[in-house]
Amino acid sequence: VRRLGLLPGGEPDGLGDDVRLTGAALDQRVVVFFPEPLRNGYQLEQWLPVLEALHARQGVAVITQDSRTAAWLRGRTALPVLCVARTATLDGIVQRSDVALALYVSHHPRNFQMLRFSTLGHVYIGHGESDKAVSASNQLKAYDRVFVAGRAAEDRILTELLWFDRSHLVRVGRPQAAAPAPRPVPAVPTVLYAPTWEGAQPSMAYSSVPTHGSTLVSSLVAAGMRVVYRPHPRTGANRRDVAAADAALRRLLEAPEAQRTGSRTDPDRPLQEAFEDVDVLVTDVSSVALEWLPTGRPLVVTVPADPAAVAAASPLLDAVPRLPSSAAGSAGTVVRRCLDDDREAPARAELVEHYLGGSDPDAALSRFLGACDDVIAARDAVRGALSRAGR
């Protein structure tokens, strides 16, 4: 079953390199623990350039529990990638190594297989800043430190979580955030429609694909706009109706009317590259909305149709036009107004610092690397004191 890839979607295949890793030790001081299946590889991919910079000064190894994920990562980075299926193998590697820091980009339950080690520091770095409920998950309390982009994350966590220790939050900015070169709006403007996925539970049902999608895109195309549809990698993973709506959207963009404006589906292009030749973003409550802010270009955010979706008021949602499902047919009019009269631009500009800690990726990278160095130094000091005390 494992070798045929027939496991449930969220389960790693557990086909590890354990035999080869017998007796192995790591030279690296940092590990990234990523037990996710391949479909969630995007969560780590965005961090690879940053982790490669950290590797140059501390050494970084990635530990996975899925052979498909490991193979995929090896094709995208020169970082050492290990696939460890057995707890005993992981125990041995940690015990034989002087790993000082473990980083985590997701809330996978299997993170606790690494979190149980008390000899190193554990830091959650996430995979994007957003106003989603999961951004203030109580699971954050499991980590020694939580690296956040800006004040918005600090405020959200301290407001939503009971008894969270403020000293565990470290503001580092967003190394992935960068402002593309300004661009004049062409005669045929390009709209990036980048909805999120349906989520794993009702409180996370932010996706507009089944509730807005076809009507929204039809309105934009009818208004003479080029639409680039960038679905989330997990769109349709949990709900057949969302998968069907996604398929319908793809067919819609292949129709002659959409083709006349150059509309297309483009799911694979890196996000920052996708931003470069786009004039407006229409998205859901998600990290994509915040990554867009440094562009300075208009932004429209949908309103979740599912009343169970947790979408509390926030500085971002208060500052941009919102599009409920009942108004999806007016998307073309809303976007045209934003292009002709971008009255929200000053408010959005103020939010770049609030959410992302600025738009200088080099400064954010420096803060991230320094924060990792600090955790390693603090861990080494504690371990050294314990060793001198004979413990």
Go through each PLM region and give its residues:
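C-terminal amphipathic helix plus adjacent low-complexity
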Residues: 332-391
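A donor-sugar binding/catalytic signature common to diverse glycosyltransferases
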Residues: 123-124, 268-310
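Extended catalytic core of nucleotide-activated donor transferases of GT-like folds
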Residues: 48, 67-139
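A nucleotide-sugar donor-handling region in carbohydrate enzymes
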Residues: 2-16, 139-211
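Conserved catalytic-core segment of nucleotide-activated headgroup transferases in glycan assembly
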Residues: 39-53, 58-59, 177-251, 357-366, ...
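Short internal beta-strands
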Residues: 57-67, 145-150, 228-232
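Nucleotide-activated donor-binding/catalytic signature segment of Leloir-type glycosyltransferases, i.e.
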Residues: 243-267
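N-terminal pre-catalytic "stem/leader" segment of glycosyltransferase-like enzymes
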Residues: 1-95, 383-391
